[in-house]
Amino acid sequence: KKHFSRTYLVIDEHQNLAGYFTLALKAMNLDKRVSNRLRKLVSGYSNKPDSAIYLIGQLGKNYANPNVKQFSGDSLINIAVDYINEAQNIVGGRAVLVECENHKILTDFYEHCGFQQLSKQSSDALLTYVISLDKLH
């Protein structure tokens, strides 16, 4: 109702729910622990601490239906990026952010997709990963 994000349902060819994801814009303040290279990737400037970034949140597959287990996480990311590219063509933007819990299966997945960890966080915080939109397509 507040229009901060949009959630998309991904339906397969048999009209089964295959997965879902949420897209939003997020204001980021990049602290001093973030390398200049990653700061430049996000904001375009190595000395600019504030930036807006696209956020892919709540990325998930439907494991409840055995008929859609073939649907990959890579496919969900690609569909989300297609929507982000449409927004980028209209309003601009440089990078995409994902946040995840510190579980190896999640961190390995995002690193496999080309995301880089933005900064090390405490063990109870979400990990933050970014990727340049140029690297996604």
Regions found by a protein language model. Give the residues of each.
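Non-catalytic substrate-recognition and accessory regions of acyl/acetyltransferase enzymes
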Residues: 1-68, 75-97, 101-137
